[in-house]
Design a protein with these regions (language model features):
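Short, amphipathic alpha-helical "recognition" segments used to contact nucleic acids or chromatin
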Residues: 1
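Residues within the helices of the helix-turn-helix
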Residues: 4-8
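RNase H-like nuclease fold core
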Residues: 9-102, 106-114, 207
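Helix N-terminus capping/helix-initiation residues
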Residues: 11-13, 75, 120, 156, ...
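Acidic/histidine-rich catalytic cores and adjacent linkers
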Residues: 94-105, 112, 142-265
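Inter-helix linker motif
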Residues: 112-136
Length: 265
């Protein structure tokens, strides 16, 4: 939908429509938090031009954005503060689904000790496949890629145990290989010889304890897809309004979040 289309539908000029928009953009709406004794949060950040990062705290079960923050990136201190504020305002977080960003993991553990953290399976699958390549040549990479691609088939605890056993056996068989190093004889500097394969394997190994909590509670989202689709639509919408200043872009996003929440009431 373009400005030209909206003007045609409303029967007004582009300048008149822009004036109406500017009135809204000058003052962002107030955000309200819904008390929830069993909140299942999905937390994720996305980036816009001009070093603008939007961090969203989405209550998955009630489909409501409880809180948002504008920043330059996902920061531990800010996310921790946000989680503490949510708790103080009556949002009792039972579980958090996130992509594994260090700032989010650390903030969740410090602000909400004992909270269940579910790692986003879509993120693990996507990142692993990026590092392992679309068509890996190395046999070890092919094997790990095949294991990773089974993630979405896990529906039961037996499936989980079988998958974990498969991955752990692969890791045991290939640990020496993925830890091989190259050393520069002149400088003494070293690096991992199979860097990308190692990155994929270590990421999965570290995430493993928090990959399958959704099997114990079906209200726990196993991915942050709900937020990512949210972000996708937001970016499509804001792309129509090119040329917004940073402050107007923030105001536009706030109005978008506000109206999305209104539809959930």
């Amino acid at each position: 939908m373009t400005l030209r289309y909206i003007c045609k539908e409303l029967g007004i000029s582009k300048r008149s429509l822009q004036r109406k928009f500017s009135i809204y953009l000058k003052s962002a709406p107030k955000f309200s938090i819904k008390k929830n004794q069993n909140a299942y949060l999905a937390i994720d950040g996305t980036y816009f031009p001009g070093d603008l990062c939007l961090v969203l705290y989405y209550d998955s079960h009630i489909k409501y954005t409880q809180l948002y923050r504008f920043s330059d990136k996902e920061r531990f201190s800010q996310i921790k503060e946000d989680l503490l504020n949510l708790k103080a305002l009556g949002v009792e977080v039972k579980a958090i689904t996130c992509d594994g960003h260090r700032a989010t993991l650390k903030a969740a553990r410090e602000a909400l000790p004992g909270v269940i953290i579910q790692r986003c399976l879509v993120h693990i699958h996507r990142e692993s496949n990026i590092w392992l390549r679309k068509r890996p040549i190395n046999q070890r990479s092919k094997e790990l890629k095949a294991i990773v691609n089974l993630i979405f088939n896990i529906k039961t605890h037996n499936d989980k145990l079988a998958w974990i056993k498969l991955f752990q056996q692969w890791f045991l068989d290939n640990e020496e290989h993925i830890n091989q190093k190259k050393i520069n004889a002149t400088t003494g500097r070293w690096w991992y010889k199979h860097k990308d394969l190692r990155r994929a394997a270590i990421m999965i190994k570290k995430a493993l304890p928090n990959m399958f909590h959704f099997l114990d509670d079906n209200l726990i989202p196993k991915s942050t897809n709900n937020i990512e689709s949210y972000f996708g639509h937001l970016k499509d919408t804001i792309s129509i309004h090119r040329g917004l200043s940073r402050s107007n872009r923030k105001s536009f996003i706030t109005w978008y979040l506000h109206y999305k929440n209104q539809t959930r009431r």
